[in-house]
Structure formats: C-alpha cells, structure tokens
C-alpha cells in the first residue's frame, strides 16, 4: 500500500514567499486573486531563512525558480545542529551545475527527468528526496554573488511521527578545475556514522584532446576499506550507460538519456553530438533501488581517464546520502568563479 492512499494524522505545511512562516491559513492575506509577494529578495552577501519549523516531521518536496545560479548556496540543518548537513550551490544540488558562462545558454536549462530531481524548462528546479527530522528543521539560502537577486520557492512537508531509526539527508559539493592529472577525483569522503549513500550528480568539462574521456573507474570504499568493495569498470558504466555513451561506435557520436535513477542528460559545446574537445556533460546516478549501506563511514572516487591515459578535465559534483546524527562537518565550499568556459 502506497503512503499517499493511507489516512494518517500528518499535518501538511508549505513555506513560500507568500507564506514565509508556513502557518496554516498563513498565505496571501488580503490578496485574493492577486500576487502579493511571489518572490523573496536576497541581497548580495545576505543569508535568508526559508524554512524554520519544529519536529517531528519531514520535507517532501522543494521547488525553486527565479535566480537559481551557482552564487546561491543552499544549506539544511537538522535537529538544531550548529553546522549544516546539506551545503551546495543550488544549481549543483539540482544536478545542473553548468548554469552560466557558456556560449550556448539561451535562458533555459536542459531537462533532467528523474524520480528524485526534476529540472524543467525555464529553470524550474524540483527535489523529491524525503528529508525526515525529529526535533527541528532549518533551511537557508545565501547569496554569495555581487548582485541582489530574487528567488521563487515553495517547500512542502508534513509534521508527523518519524521512526527512531531514520537517517538524516545529507549533500556535499565538490569541484576540481582541473582534476590533478594521474589522481582520482573524490566524489565524497569524510563521512562518519551509519547510513547509506544514495547518489551523485556530476558535471564534467573537457580539456585537451578530443578523445574518449569515460574510461575512469568509479570506486566505493565502505567503512575501513583499504581497497574498494564496489568497483565500476568505467565512468559511463557507473552512470548506467556503455561504450562511451555512444549510439554509433563507428562514427563516435554521443546519445543523451534520462531515466528514473540515472542519465547523461545534457551536452554543451560545439558539435555536441560527436567526440570533441571542450564539451561539457551533465550526469546523475541515484541509488534508490540499490542504496550503498555503511556502518562507520563511506568514500567514493572517480578516475579521470580516457583511451590515451589520465586526463585533466574539470569535475564538479554533489553527493547525497542518509546517516545518523551527529555527522562530521562537511568539507568547506571552494568558492570562486565556478565555471568560466
């Protein structure tokens, strides 16, 4: 029986610019049939609180639009922890890290059509990861840019009983521009606690020669592993593709795809259908059907390698997992101009 057909005592809430407290009957007062306050203005250097509510409960869906570029940083705090369990540029959190500064941007984002994250045309960002909490939930947005910006949002959830054994949602951003040649890129490390790894979104930017770039192997280290317990033979294989993401091995052309839990859904750059230099790719893999369980910790790396050996491409990622609290502090954000091509 699916949860949505079961009657319960849960109480729905929704935080938005029209109802910033999330209170019952708290939205659009005095503004029937009009828009009173559809956006929240976030000044340069300012952090605003989008959600602040006591538990127990669960965040069930998140929607953003407006300015949703990489200068906005989203953070989530569970059960009054002093440091965030989620910290990432908003565009990278939603798997669309190449959001600006490339020549073929036309104001729209490529469509990401998965079960956990949906990126709709026109920059509609949607998240469906369930995020339970026992005592408290706080979600903030920081504007690290030089200009004031506006954000549309609605964050929906419910106050309800949650089991003692819940895992708390976490997400961490990483980037290396470029990856050090001959060394693996780290998707995530430093996790301490019991939980399960549930996926990653990845943006890659090609540097140098125009040969295949997907020979790098994905490795997962569970608890105190010296060598990986899970080992994928290539980058495209980890993202559930094969043979260089190709649809024609003879002419070496790419084929995008977007499924419930995995995809290589967008390519940016000249001659984007063919193996070429200076292209950029957006990928995702969500371990909803096959979560990777760990008792004390978890680490994942991805080689940057092509047919001709190690490469030095630009990698950007956001990893997602659930775990017990308290968790280790996330690695600090490297904040610079994230994407310059």
Regions found by a protein language model. Name each.
Residues 1-341:
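Beta-strand-centric surfaces of beta-sandwich/beta-rich domains
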């Amino acid at each position: 029986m699916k949860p949505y057909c079961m009657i319960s005592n849960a109480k729905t809430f929704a935080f938005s610019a029209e109802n910033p407290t999330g209170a019952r009957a708290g939205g659009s007062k005095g503004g029937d049939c009009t828009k009173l306050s559809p956006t929240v203005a976030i000044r340069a250097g300012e952090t605003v609180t989008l959600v602040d509510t006591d538990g127990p409960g669960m965040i069930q869906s998140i929607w953003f639009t407006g300015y949703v570029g990489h200068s906005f940083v989203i953070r989530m705090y569970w059960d009054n922890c002093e440091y965030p369990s989620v910290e990432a540029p908003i565009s990278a959190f939603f798997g669309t890290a190449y959001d600006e500064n490339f020549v073929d941007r036309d104001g729209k984002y490529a469509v990401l059509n998965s079960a956990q994250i949906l990126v709709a045309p026109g920059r509609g960002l949607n998240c469906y990861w369930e995020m339970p909490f026992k005592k408290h939930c706080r979600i903030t947005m920081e504007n690290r840019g030089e200009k004031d910006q506006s954000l549309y949002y609605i964050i929906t959830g419910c106050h309800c009983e949650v089991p003692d054994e819940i895992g708390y949602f976490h997400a961490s951003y990483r980037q290396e521009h470029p990856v050090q040649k001959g060394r693996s890129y780290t998707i995530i490390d430093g996790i301490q606690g019991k939980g399960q790894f549930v996926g990653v979104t990845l943006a890659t930017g090609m540097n140098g020669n125009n040969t295949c770039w997907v020979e790098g192997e994905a490795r997962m280290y569970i608890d105190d592993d010296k060598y990986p317990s899970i080992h994928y033979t290539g980058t495209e294989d980890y993202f559930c593709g094969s043979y260089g993401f190709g649809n024609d091995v003879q002419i070496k052309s790419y084929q995008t795809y977007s499924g419930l839990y995995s995809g290589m859904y967008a390519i940016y750059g000249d001659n984007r259908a063919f193996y070429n230099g200076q292209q950029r790719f957006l990928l995702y893999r969500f371990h909803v059907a096959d979560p990777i369980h760990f008792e004390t910790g978890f680490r994942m790396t991805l080689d940057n390698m092509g047919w001709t050996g190690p490469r030095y491409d630009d990698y950007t990622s956001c990893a997602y997992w659930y775990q017990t609290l308290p968790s280790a502090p996330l690695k600090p954000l490297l904040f610079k101009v994230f994407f310059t091509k």
